[in-house]
């Protein structure tokens, strides 16, 4: 089954800005996934939700070059640690205000898979990501043979490396057989349209 996730953000196409605040500037964060969403807090925007108290993410799409404004590839990592801090790098690992320049970032936000952590495992599965400037970032992955293929719900988390604009939520996934039937139906519709012309 093909999983495609679109993150709508005006930041798309602007990686590398604010290079005075961090090496390479602000980049794109990795995409994190889990079978359920358990944000911290009851406020509408979950402003106090962070790596220590929110959803424990179970998979991460580790980007090949988070400062590319065209996209690239990513590696799927299984996040096996008991908490997010064991599995990920946080916003403060990428950005701080130590350069005697006033800056703003959201402390404690999961931003990147930590590929050097002993609690994460590269699954060997790769996907692609593309940037639509001023609009969106699109992640595409073939989930065949992964546990993601068995999820009925899919929670996600994405942010820039500064952690300022966190996008989180949950959606229901169709059954893999339903996706295959839908694809077959659309193919049949395309064939019937061609034949009728």
Where are these predicted regions, by residue range?
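A short, hydrophobic C-terminal helix/tail in secreted or cell-surface proteins
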Residues: 174-193
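C-terminal outer-membrane/trafficking sorting elements
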Residues: 196-197
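Surface-exposed extracytoplasmic segments
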Residues: 1-172
């Amino acid at each position: 089954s093909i999983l495609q996730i679109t993150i709508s953000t005006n930041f798309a196409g602007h990686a590398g800005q604010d290079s005075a605040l961090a090496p390479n500037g602000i980049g794109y964060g990795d995409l994190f996934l889990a079978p359920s969403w358990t944000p911290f807090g009851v406020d509408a925007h979950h402003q106090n939700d962070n790596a220590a108290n929110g959803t424990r993410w179970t998979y991460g799409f580790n980007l090949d070059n988070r400062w590319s404004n065209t996209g690239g590839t990513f590696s799927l990592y299984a996040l096996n640690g008991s908490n997010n801090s064991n599995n990920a790098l946080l916003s403060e690992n990428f950005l701080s205000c130590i350069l005697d320049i006033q800056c703003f970032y959201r402390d404690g936000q999961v931003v990147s898979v930590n590929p050097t952590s002993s609690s994460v495992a590269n699954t060997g599965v790769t996907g692609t990501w593309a940037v639509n400037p001023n609009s969106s970032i699109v992640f595409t992955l073939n989930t065949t043979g992964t546990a993601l293929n068995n999820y009925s719900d899919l929670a996600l988390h994405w942010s820039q490396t500064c952690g300022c604009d966190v996008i989180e939520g949950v959606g229901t996934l169709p059954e893999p057989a339903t996706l295959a039937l839908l694809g077959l139906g659309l193919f049949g519709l395309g064939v019937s349209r061609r034949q009728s012309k």
